[in-house]
Amino acid sequence: MTTIQFYHLRSTSLERAVPKLMEKALASKARVVVLARDAAMIRRLSDQLWSANPQGFLPHGTQEDPHPEWQPIYLTTAQENPNQATILMVLNGTIPAEFSRYEKLLDLFDGNDEDSVAAARERYRHYRSQPDIALQYVLQQPGGGWKIEQEFGTPSAAA
């Protein structure tokens, strides 16, 4: 079963939200593939992962780096899983063809953009019609934290 979590961003940009979610994933020893919109987004995310944590950095690689299989976080624009990740973070507004191969899919969207919200609703409806799926709608709180607002299926803990 794949758990799909829709992260409704209200007060944080994608580039700022990703490092916080990645810290949680790495703390649980999970590997992550981040599916980005384009190369420019990958560069911005990579910069954030290098600088988001004052005590260090979040180890990661991109399509341009050697040995993607070694990377705990792999940033890409392609639907691939070279690091054998169990978590897929989708930032490009798509429904990946092989999403069910992951234990968890995190779909982040800009809650301040009506088109982004409408597209997220369409993706939610699509996933809800799929077998063996648990859905969670996770709303960003004013302080930047997260709260699960709605669940469908058998959910796992929020990332």
Protein language model features and the residues they cover:
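ASCE RecA-like P-loop NTPase motor cores
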Residues: 2-4, 25-31, 40, 86, ...
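Short, surface-exposed amphipathic charged segments that create phosphate/polyanion-binding patches used
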Residues: 21-23, 71-76, 150-157
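Short, solvent-exposed amphipathic alpha-helical segments in soluble enzyme
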Residues: 21-24, 48-52, 105-106, 122-126
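Helix-adjacent hinge/juxtasegments
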Residues: 48-91
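Long, hydrophobic N-terminal alpha-helical segment
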Residues: 1-50
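Short acidic, S/G/P-rich loop/turn micro-motifs used as interaction or catalytic elements
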Residues: 12-13, 40-41, 80-83, 94-98, ...
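Acidic beta-strand-to-loop metal/phosphate-binding motif
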Residues: 35, 88-90, 105-109
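Glycine-rich, aromatic-bearing surface loops/beta-hairpins
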Residues: 104-159
